[in-house]
Amino acid sequence: CLNEGGNVVNIAIELNGQPPLQVYVKPCREYKIILRSIDLGAMEVVTTYGEVRDFMQVGSPFSIPKAALVLAGFQPGFSTESYVSLEEQLKAFGSGMEITLLSAIPAGSGLGTSSILASTVLGAISDFCGLNWDKNEICNRTLILEQLLTTGGGWQDQYGGVLRGVKLL
């Protein structure tokens, strides 16, 4: 599309009356980040900036939420404030956090799942942290997230999941 131009017709759908990708963020008493994937049955506890920065680990079920945390400022160089440790930053924030993912669409389905999941994670973190990102900002940050992951995702996939209804992109 970049070289030749073009458009994509896209429709956002629900599966069994629910969004096919869901992300929940809630406070955690301990000053750490707990990552969970319901559909994969996986969990990881993140306590250091190094563990957040480890988003490029091949095969990790938590690459997307870790990269989203980086873009939300939970990494030196991505925050306007300076903290000695992730624990110190979470203390200043007021709590740790637990991020839970649920995907009813298999990875590699060709339905833009990773882009839409990235947007969903970024939106949930924005809401939880009071970052006030609008839908356009979330979609733009999704492009950056995919570049951080070097996945080279599509340029429009996230808009399909973030914006309701039928769209010509």
Task: List each model region and its residues.
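ATP-binding N-lobe of GHMP and related small-molecule kinases
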Residues: 1-111, 123-135, 140, 163-169
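Short, conserved phosphate/pyrophosphate- and ester-handling motifs at nucleotide-, phospho-/glycolipid
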Residues: 114
